[in-house]
From Swiss-Prot:
Protein name, UniProt field: UPF0391 membrane protein Tbd_2239
UniProt organism field: Thiobacillus denitrificans (strain ATCC 25259 / T1)
A Pfam family assignment: DUF1328
Coiled coil location: none
Keywords tagged on the record: Cell membrane, Membrane, Transmembrane, Transmembrane helix
Regions crossing the membrane: 4-24, 33-53
Subcellular location field: Cell membrane
Annotated Gene Ontology cellular component terms: plasma membrane
Amino acid sequence: MLKWALVFFVISLIAGFFGFTGVASGAAAIAKILFYIAVALFLLFLVLGVFAVKSIK
């Protein structure tokens, strides 16, 4: 998912460079949403992993 966020970020930079501000803002918004989803999933799995290790001990 972070890969797609990076792809949309690069698309946003390139579109902004060439003057396509609508495309740039749309791609940046998608990249931001995907990044926050990836961070939320990472934190969720981190917490689940900590609880799993504690339950095994």
